[in-house]
Amino acid sequence: MGFLKSLFGVTDDNAADEKKQSTDKDFEILKNDGIRALRQCQCNADYAVKCFEHALAIKDDAEVREQLAVALYQLGEYAQSAEQYGKLVELEPDNAALIMRKAEMAYLADEYDVVTADCARILELQPDNSRACLLYARGYMGNGNDIPAIAMLTKAIALDADNLDAYLLRGQQLLKLGDINGAKEDAEKLVAEAPDSEEAQLLLARVNEALGNHEEASNKYNKVGDLNPFSVEAFRERGAVKLAMGDKEGAEADMRQVLEIAPDTLDGTTGDFTAEGREGIQCKVEQAYKNINPLGL
């Protein structure tokens, strides 16, 4: 048999080469089809995943695996995306950027222990990485560890004074824990740096309400409403402030706005008040606000 193959110019080596060329061609087609699909439209992510998975079945390739991780992220498969980044990190254990992407996917997948472990590793490699400190804090917060989270946010700010996300999270955490003055400092810093930030104005409104400054809180909620006319939090919490100030009509108007934007926001309440008398509406509004703690304290 070997003699006949030799006679007709066919050898085992030639057959192996032809097979390799064929599989290499298939790999490139699958890889390029997947990349093209991702670039064209996020709606093609499912097809791209299939292309990349088939390509990896032919040959392990770091570029294809990273593209697979991106496609899985676009599909909302965060845990699977983190798994793919994890395999890339195994190849480059000191690549802080890859570890960060893995940690970000793990955070989206609610895998907070993975997040904190990955961020700790990043800080070993890059002690001055403020973004890693911020994500580290988010991981702590996900596990309910508020004090370490605040410490890590403070470190993030110390490393980068322009890390406004760290100021926002720290202010929110301080307010949650009852450190209103500390929260106020962060909120005022945020509003000074980013006056058009809805979240910054909302934090300052909540701080003022916690301090009992109803009028100022109401003004800040007005600002949030100007920035985002569909902010359920702004209308709901401003309504609570108005009710505390004795403005039942104003509170009722804000409640109507809440129910118009998000009819299912309040359990046992519908957006249709037309069948009720005015006293019934006010009663419902008051009861609704009694069930709401807008400051989360």
Regions found by a protein language model. Give the residues of each.
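Terminal, low-structured helical/coil segments at or just beyond the last alpha-helical repeat
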Residues: M1-N14, E18, E252-A253, E260-L297
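Alpha-helical segment of the N-proximal tetratricopeptide repeat
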Residues: K20-Q80, A97, R101-E111, R138, ...
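Helix-start (N-cap) detector for alpha-helical repeat units in TPR-like alpha-solenoids
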Residues: F27, A62-V64, A96-A97, Y112, ...
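Position-specific recognition of the canonical hydrophobic site in helix A of tetratricopeptide repeat
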Residues: L38-Q40, Y73, M100, Y107, ...
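Structural signature of tandem alpha-helical TPR/SEL1-like repeats
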Residues: C41-K50, L75-K87, A109-R121, G142-K155, ...
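Short coil turns that delineate tetratricopeptide repeat
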Residues: K59-D60, P93, P127, A161, ...
